[in-house]
Amino acid sequence: MSKEDMIEFSGTVTELLPNAMFRVKLDNEHMILAHTSGKMRKNRIRVLAGDRVNVEMTPYDLSKGRITFRFK
């Protein structure tokens, strides 16, 4: 799947889950399950509950996503 096919949303991390998973509440009130992207893991960017994040999702499964950016 190419990068152009991904859908981007903004949201807030509501819950930290095991195995580096997060529950994210999107701005459109949907709750999804998300994990951090590889570059965020490599650069050790911490994500905590309450952080504003960008999430990219595939159009095939709108219940899971990947956190690509954490706002300051």
From Swiss-Prot:
UniProt GO molecular function: ribosome binding; rRNA binding; translation initiation factor activity
PROSITE patterns assigned: S1_IF1_TYPE
Record-annotated S1-like domain positions: 1-72
Gene3D superfamilies: Nucleic acid-binding proteins
One matching Pfam family: eIF-1a
Domain of life: Bacteria
Function, in words: One of the essential components for the initiation of protein synthesis. Stabilizes the binding of IF-2 and IF-3 on the 30S subunit to which N-formylmethionyl-tRNA(fMet) subsequently binds. Helps modulate mRNA selection, yielding the 30S pre-initiation complex (PIC). Upon addition of the 50S ribosomal subunit IF-1, IF-2 and IF-3 are released leaving the mature 70S translation initiation complex.
Subunit and interaction comment: Component of the 30S ribosomal translation pre-initiation complex which assembles on the 30S ribosome in the order IF-2 and IF-3, IF-1 and N-formylmethionyl-tRNA(fMet); mRNA recruitment can occur at any time during PIC assembly.
This protein's name: Translation initiation factor IF-1
